[in-house]
Amino acid sequence: MKSLLDLFKQFTPDEHFDAIKIGMASPEKIRSWSFGEVKKPETINYRTFKPERDGLFCAKIFGPIKDYECLCGKYKRLKHRGVICEKCGVEVTQTKVRRERMGHIDLAAPCAHIWFLKSLPSRLGLVLDMTLRDIERVLYFEAYVVTDPGMTPLKKFGIMSEDDYDAKRKEYGDEFVAKMGAEGIKELLEGIDIEIEIEKLRGDLTGSEVKVKKNAKRLKVLEAFKKSGIKPEWMILEVLPVLPPDLRPLVPLDGGRFATSDLNDLYRRVINRNSRLRRLLELKAPEIIARNEKRMLQEAVDSLLDNGRRGKAMTGANKRALKSLADMIKGKSGRFRQNLLGKRVDYSGRSVITVGPTLKLHQCGLPKLMALELFKPFIFSRLEAMGIATTIKAAKKEVEAGTPVVWDILEEVIKEHPVMLNRAPTLHRLGIQAFEPILIEGKAIQLHPLVCAAFNADFDGDQMAVHVPLSVEAQLEARTLMLASNNVLFPASGEPSIVPSQDVVLGLYHATREKINGKGEGLVFADTGEVQRALDAGEAELHAKISVRLTEWTKDKATGEFVPETKLVDTTVGRALLSEILPKGLPFSNLNKALKKKEISKLINASFRKCGLKDTVVFADKLLQNGFRLATHAGFSVAIDDMLVPPQKAEILARAEAEVKEIEQQYVSGLVTAGERYNKVVDIWGKAGDDVSKVMMDQLKVQKTIDRNGKEVNEESFNAIYMMADSGARGSAAQIRQLAGMRGLMAKPDGSIIETPITANFREGLNVLQYFISTHGARKGLADTALKTANSGYLTRRLVDVTQDLVVTEDDCGTSNGSLMRAIVEGGEVIESLRDRILGRTAAEEVLHPETRAVLAQPGRMLDEDLIEELEAAGVDEVKVRTALTCETRYGLCAKCYGRDLGRGGLINLGEAVGVIAAQSIGEPGTQLTMRTFHIGGAASRAAVASSVEAKSNGIIGFNATMRYVTNTKGELVVIARSGEIIIQDEHGRERERHKVPYGATLTVKADQTIKAGTILANWDPLTRPIITEYAGTVKFENVEEGLTVAKQVDEVTGLSTLVVIDPKRRGSAKVVRPQVKLVDADGKEVKIPGTDHSVTIGFQVGALIQVRDGQEVGPGEVLARIPMEGQKTRDITGGLPRVAELFEARSPKDKGMLAEMTGTISFGKETKGKVRLQITDPDGKVWDELVPKEKNVLVHEGQVVNKGELIVDGPADPQDILRLLGIEELSRYIVDEVQDVYRLQGVKINDKHIEVIVRQMLRRVVVENPGESTYIAGEQVERSEILNTNEALQAEGKLPATYSNVLLGITKASLSTDSFISAASFQETTRVLTEAAIMGKRDELRGLKENVIVGRLIPAGTGLAYHQARKAKDAMDEAERRAIADAEAAELASAGTDDAAAEIDGSADTAD
C-alpha cells in the first residue's frame, strides 16, 4: 500500500508538522530543487502548440502536458509509468507535476536580491556597514568598490568613481583590487567573518546615542545570520529558480490569441539578457558593453522579483506594470488574503430573504429548488442505498427529472441537518448562525424575525448565503454551538440579542397600556380564561384596569420543584392575558407594566437568568407571535392631525428673534466679537429649538379624559405617533420634533452650524430656502456613511489581527493580582454602576463587609447576579477583580481572569477565542459611531457655561487628595488646585457623587460638612480663567511694560482701561521676557514660599487681562489677572471612530499635556526664545527639566509640590507617558474609560473586558533594559512570554536574568511584531516581514488562529484546541515510547560490549566511550 501511495506521490493525512521555518536558499539548494536549466526564452511552438524544448514550458524539465503520455506520443497509459522517453526525454507521469517541478536559470553574472537591498532598513547595507546609496552605485555599475587594498593606503569597502579609479590605477598600478557590480559586493560579503564582527560590535555598544542605535541594529542582523546559519553571500543570486509552469499558465483564447501570466514576460527578459551576456563574455566583448549588459540583467532580475521597487516598473505591451512575484503574494488580492484566508466554499447558495413569522427560533425556510441542489450528495447516496439508482449517473438523471420519490428523499435528508445562514458583512460571530431548514415554495429564504437584530438584517432586499455542513462533526458543531436558539445573548455586552422590535413592540406596548375609565374598569376575575371571555363578549376593553386571580410558580429552594401560588393582582385586561405565556419561575410583576422595548429586553434577560435557555427561547417565540397578533388587532393609523404643533411655538420663536436682534446690536456697537456673536446666536436658536420640542412633547404626552367620577383628568396619550416613539418601536423624540416642532439648526458639510435655523416643521412644510439648507447637511451624511463603513472595517481588521492568537488555554493561572473596580461617577451622576463593572468577573481577593468585616466572597469566586445583590445590600463600593491584563498565563489567558462568557452566561470554556470575540465586539458597532462629532452648537457650547455645581444627594463633604485652597480676605475658600474634586459620601462612607471644581472657584462648603441635596457647592466665573495669588503682599511688576509686553485696551462703552499681555510672536522686541509679578512684604523684601528660598513669582499668560496695579496690596486668594475663555483655543475633540482608532494605535495626541516625571518641587529656570524652562527637584536633590512652549498653558507655579504623573502642562495625556509614569493599571483604566466614553455617547454597550483584552495585546512586548547574562541586546523588543521563559532558564542555571520594562505598541505595530511571521506577512508590509523572517531563519510555531488557517489545519481554538492538545500528547507518548525502545537497545548493546571488554582488557580504554 505504501509503495502504491509513493507511486501517486500523495500526502498522507499523517504528515503532521508543528512549525514552519523560513530561510534563504543557497545556490546549491536552488539547483537541488530544479529539474533542469531553462535555456531558451521560447514558450510554445506557434504551429503545434507543444512546448519548446529547454524553454519556459519545456516538458522535459517540468513534466508531461497530458496525464501519463510523453510529448511525442510514443509512451501512453499507466503501464509505462515512470519511463523516460528516449526520443523526447519526457518522463511519463501525471501532468500535475507541472505544478510542483521547478527549473532554474544559471546567471552569467551574479545579481543582488532586491528585497535584501531595497527593503528598508537595507540588510545588505547593515551587513556591509555601507550606505544604501553607495551599494546601489556599485551594483548598477556607477562606481567601484575596493575589495582588496593590498599595500596601498586605500580602505577596504571604499567607493570610487570611474575617474578616481583611473587615477588610482595610474598611481598604484595593480597593487589593489576594486570591482563593480554584484561580483564586488559578493566578494565583500564572503570576506566578512560574522563571529569577529559580532565580538567587535558587542564591545562597541557605548558612545553617542546614534552610534549605539546603529550598532545595535547591525548586531541584530549579524546575530540573526549567525543563529540561522545563513551565509550573507546568499543575498546575491547566482542561480535563479523558475516557477513551475502551471503556476504561470499560458491559456489559449478563441481567435488564436494567448493570455499569459506576466511572470512569463519577466522570465523571458531575464533569459534573453542572460544569454546575450553569456555570448558577450565568450566573445570577450569590451568591458563597457559587458558592463551595460550586466546592469540590464540585474534590472531584469529586480523586476522579476519585485517590479517597481527600484526605478520605473517594467511594462507590458499595454503600458501597464507587470505583476511580479512579490505582487503575487502581497495586498488584498495577493496569495495570502485572497486564497489562503478567504476561500470560496462549495455547497452554498444565496438568495433574497423574506420574513418568516410562523417559524420557530431555530428554523429557517429554505426554497425547495435550493435545498435540492445543496443536498445533492446526500440525495444521491440515499437513492443508491434504496436501490432506486445503481450509479451516480442514474441518480443524477433521477434528480433532474424531479420525480416524487426525490422530493420524499429530500424531506428525509433535511431532517435534523442544520444549515448555516450568513449575512454579509459578518461583523461579529452572530453574523453566521445555524438553523434547521424547513422546505418552502418560492425562491426566497425565510428568516425568523427575532434573529434580524443579530444579523442586522431587514427585508428591503437583503440577501443571505446558505452553507451546508457536510461531515458529522461539522453538523454536530453547527447544532450545539451555532444553532440560533443557543445564541441568545450578544457576546459584546451579555444583553439578549433576540429582542423583538418594531411592530411586535408596538403590539405588546399597546396591549399593556392602561386607560382611565375604560369599559369594564374595576371588574374582578377568577382566572385569565374569564378575562378572555369578557373581552370577546365586549364587556371589558383591552386597556381596562381590573383585578384578576393569577397562579405564580416559585421554585422551592429545598426541592428545586416549582410550587404554584395564587394571588389577586391589580392589572389590565391585556397584561392578564399575556401572563399566560410567562415561563414558570418568572413572577408576573415583570410583565405588569407598559412593555416598552427596554422593558421587553429586561424581561427576556430576567427570563434567561432565572429560567434558563430553553424556556426563554420558547417565551421569546410566544412574545413574538402575540406581538404580531396584537399589533394587527390594534389597527394603528397615523394621520396628519396626529402631529400636534404647539400653540406656544410662535411666542418662543418671537422671543428668540428679539434676543438675536439684541446680540446683533451689541455686535454692531462692538461689545461682542464676531466669534462670540456667532456662538451666542447658535446658542439662542439651539435653546429655542429645545423649548419648542419640550412644549410639543408635553402636549403630545397627555390627553384629557373623564374618570368614573365624572372629573376631567390627564392620562397618558394614545396618540399613534407618540406611542410609536415612546414604546421604542420606531422614531424618536428628535424625529417627532421635526414633524411637529421645528427642524432647528442645520449643519454645513464641513460640520459647522448654519446660524439661521429652519423654524418650520414638516407638517407646516418648508419653503425653498429652508429646503435647500436641509439638503446641504443630508448629502454630507450620505458621503460620510460610505467612508465610515470602510474605516470601521479596517479598524476591525487591525483589531482581529492583533488579538487573533489569544485563546483561553488554562483554568486558573493562580495570580492574586487584579484591578480595583468602583462605580464611574461623573458630574455627580453614576454613569456606570459597580454592578455593571464587576458582573461576571472573578474576585481577586476576599470581599469583606464594610462594617462587620465578614467575608462575603472568597478569592476566585465568580461574581454573579445573586452574589452582587448581597454585595450591594452590604454597601460594598469597591471590589478587586481579576482582569485579562493581570493574567499570568504565558500563551493565552486563563478562564478565571477572563470570567464569564458573555455570549453564553457561564464561566468561559477552554479554547474560546476571546481575542477575536473582543475585536469583533469593538469593531462591530464601529459603523454606528460617527466619523466626526458635529459640534452641536446648542449642546456643546451650553455645557461649557456651567458656573456652579450643586449636590444631587444628601451626604458629607470630602475633597480628593489633590484639592488645595486658600482663605481670602472675605473669608471665602478659593480653590488653587488644578484637579480638585468635591466628593459627597453617605453615612457609611460610600461615594455618592464626585464633582470637578475648576481652578479659582469659590467653595461654599467646608470639609466634613453635612449637606442636603440641592446645596450649591462652589461658584466660578465661566467665561474667564483667573490667575490667583496664594500669599499676601504688595504687588511688584516685572517686565510689565506698555507697548513691549502689554498693551492698553480701552473699553469703548465704559471707558475703563485694562492691560493685556501681548503674544510674544507679535512683539517687536523683548520676545523672551515674561511679564510677571513678585510679592514684597512691608520692608520691601521679596516674599518667599514657606520652607524654600524661592520667591513668590506669578507669570502672566498671553491674553491675560491684568486686574491689579503696581504697588497694590493683595491678600491670599485674590485675582491678579483673568484670561478670557474666548482667547483660549478650544481643543478640537476628535470623537467617534477616529478617536477609538487613535487610542488603540497608541498615538501621541497633538498638543499633548505634560506629566510630572517625578515627585518634587516646581521651579522655573532660564527661559529661551519662545520657551519656558520647567524644573522639578525631588527630595534627594535630583533635577529634571523640560522646555515648554510659551503658548502652552502651564498648570503649576514656582514652589508647588507635584506628584509623579500629575498633569503639569494642559493638554490631552499621552498613553506612553501614562504607562511610563503611572504603570499598566492606570494605562488600562485610561484606555478603557476613553474608549467607553466614545461608545457610551452612541448608546452602545460593550463590556470592559473586551477592551482590556486588546490592551493586553498592545502590551505583549517588552524592551530589554539590561540583558544580564542572556543573548539579548539592550533596547531590543521581545515577546513578554519569551523573556519570562529565558529568565527562568537563566535563574535555574544561577545566571543573571535580563531586566526589562513595559512598552506600549499600537495595534498595527503589535500585529506586525508578533512572533508568527505568517500572521504578520498576511496582515501588512508582506515584503518587509518575509525579508526579516528569512534572514533570521524564523520558526513559526503555529500558535495563533491565522497561521493555522493559512496552512490549512484546524485552528487551535474551540474544538480544535482539544484536537491539537490530544495530537501533541500522542506525539509525546510515541516519542517517549521510541526513546524507551532505543534506550533498551542501547543498554543491550552496552551489556554485550562489557562482555567483550572483559575478554579484551587492553582494548577497554577505546570502548569506554
From Swiss-Prot:
Catalytic activity: RNA(n) + a ribonucleoside 5'-triphosphate = RNA(n+1) + diphosphate
Bilayer-spanning residue ranges: none
Cellular component terms (Gene Ontology): DNA-directed RNA polymerase complex
Molecular function in Gene Ontology: DNA binding; DNA-directed RNA polymerase activity; magnesium ion binding; zinc ion binding
Broad EC category: transferase
A GO BP entry: DNA-templated transcription
Functional note: DNA-dependent RNA polymerase catalyzes the transcription of DNA into RNA using the four ribonucleoside triphosphates as substrates.
Family the UniProt entry places it in: Belongs to the RNA polymerase beta' chain family.
Residues annotated as binding Zn(2+) 2: 813, 887, 894, 897
InterPro entries: DNA-dir_RpoC_beta_prime, DNA-dir_RpoC_beta_prime_bact, RNA_pol_asu, RNA_pol_N, RNA_pol_Rpb1_1, RNA_pol_Rpb1_3, RNA_pol_Rpb1_3_sf, RNA_pol_Rpb1_4
Species this protein is from: Acidovorax ebreus (strain TPSY) (Diaphorobacter sp. (strain TPSY))
Subunit structure: The RNAP catalytic core consists of 2 alpha, 1 beta, 1 beta' and 1 omega subunit. When a sigma factor is associated with the core the holoenzyme is formed, which can initiate transcription.
EC number(s) on file: 2.7.7.6
Name of the protein this chain belongs to: DNA-directed RNA polymerase subunit beta'
Co-factor binding comment: Binds 1 Mg(2+) ion per subunit. Binds 2 Zn(2+) ions per subunit.
Cofactor(s) the record lists: Mg(2+); Zn(2+)
Binding residues for Zn(2+) 1: 70, 72, 85, 88
CDD domains documented for this protein: RNAP_beta'_C (cd02655), RNAP_beta'_N (cd01609)
Keywords attached to this entry: DNA-directed RNA polymerase, Magnesium, Metal-binding, Nucleotidyltransferase, Transcription, Transferase, Zinc
Binding site for Mg(2+): 458, 460, 462
